[in-house]
Design a protein with these regions (language model features):
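Short alpha-helical segment immediately N-terminal to, or the first helix within
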Residues: 40-41, 99, 224-225
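Short, Lys/Arg-enriched anionic-surface-contact patches
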Residues: 18-37, 196-217
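Residues within the helices of the helix-turn-helix
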Residues: 49, 115, 233
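Hydrophobic packing positions characteristic
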Residues: 143-204, 208
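Polyanion-binding surface elements
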Residues: 37-62
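Long, charge-rich, low-complexity alpha-helical segments
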Residues: 215-258
C-alpha cells in the first residue's frame, strides 16, 4: 500500500505513526526480479520492519535474527544497505517466533536446532522447505520424514531420538504446506496458541501481503483506517465484515510482544 493511499485516510501525524509501525520511508528498495525457474517464495519482498509488523514481532528482534553479529538467518536479498526478506525468510522467522514465545525454546536451543537442520537437510531454509512440528511437552523440535515406509518424527533437540506422533502438537495450523512440504501460506496471529486464523499471507495473493483470511483485503489498510479515527464497526461496514473480526485484526498491530 502506498503512503499516498494511507495519507488519504488521516493527518500527517497519523501517516507518520503508520510509517513508524511498518518502517516505511521515502527510500524505496528496488524489488528484485524473479529469475527464470526461481520460486517466488525465494524472492525478496518485505523490508525487515514491514515483516516484523506483519508477524507482530519487535523489529529489533527481526534485525537481530537477520542482520545481527550472531544471526540465525541470511536475508534472501541484500545489496548494499537494501535488505529484503522473502516469503521463506518470513516463514522461518515466524516458526522461530512461535517456538520462542509460546513453547519457551531458549535462544541457545533455537540456534542449535536451526544449525543442525541446515546441515542435515542440505537446504538453505529448512524450516520453510521441510515439514516440522513443535512438541511442547518435551521442548523439542521435530523433523517429520519417512523411515522404512512409515512416517515418523525425529527429535533433534534430544540427539535424534524418535518420538511418537501422538505426542506431536502440530505447528501446521499456522503454516500451510504444499505436497512437497514447502510452506505456501502463513496464518500469523499474535495469539498463536489460539485456533483462530484471522490473518494470512500467501505469495499468490497480493504478492504475499498480509490480508484478512479468505479475502484480498490488506490488513494494513484496516489499520490505517483505525489510525484515521474509524471505529471497528465503521470499518466492518465498509468491507462487509464482522466487527469482531476487525477488532482481532486491529489487535494484531496494537502492541508488540516482548
Amino acid at each position: 500500500m502506498s503512503n499516498r493511499t494511507i495519507a488519504s485516510y488521516g493527518t500527517t501525524q497519523q501517516l507518520r505513526s503508520f510509517e513508524r509501525r511498518f518502517g516505511y520511508t521515502s527510500h524505496v528498495s528496488p524489488r528484485p526480479q524473479i529469475r527464470e525457474g526461481q520460486d517466488k517464495r525465494d524472492v525478496g519482498r518485505y523490508s525487515i520492519p514491514e515483516a516484523a509488523g506483519y508477524l507482530a514481532v519487535p523489529a529489533r528482534t527481526m534485525r537481530r535474527w537477520f542482520l545481527g553479529e550472531r544471526r540465525l538467518f541470511n536475508p534472501s536479498y541484500r545489496r548494499g544497505g537494501d535488505v529484503l526478506l522473502s516469503f521463506n525468510d518470513v516463514t522461518e522467522a515466524y516458526i522461530i517466533e512461535v517456538l520462542r514465545n509460546h513453547y519457551d525454546f531458549s535462544p541457545i536451543k533455537l540456534r542449535r536446532i536451526v544449525e543442525a537442520l541446515r546441515v542435515r537437510s542440505n537446504l538453505d531454509k529448512p524450516l520453510a522447505q521441510r515439514e516440522f512440528y513443535a512438541i511442547p511437552e518435551f521442548q523439542s523440535f521435530v523433523d517429520r520424514r519417512v523411515i522404512r515406509g512409515q512416517q515418523t518424527n525425529i527429535d533433534l533437540a534430544h540427539h535424534g531420538n524418535l518420538v511418537f506422533d501422538q505426542f506431536v502438537a502440530a505447528l501446521g495450523k499456522r503454516v500451510q504446506r504444499d505436497r512437497r512440504g514447502h510452506a505456501c501460506r502463513l496464518y500469523p496471529w499474535k495469539e498463536s496458541d489460539s485456533d483462530e486464523s484471522p490473518l494470512s499471507m500467501d505469495p499468490d495473493v497480493l504478492s504475499g501481503e498480509l490480508v484478512v483470511s479468505g479475502t484480498r483485503i490488506p490488513a494494513t489498510m484496516l489499520y490505517a483506517k483505525k489510525l484515521a479515527g474509524k471505529t471497528a464497526a465503521q470499518i466492518a461496514r465498509s468491507y462487509h465484515l464482522k466487527p469482531a473480526l476487525i477488532r482481532k485484526v486491529l489487535n494484531h498491530f496494537e502492541r508488540e510482544k516482548p
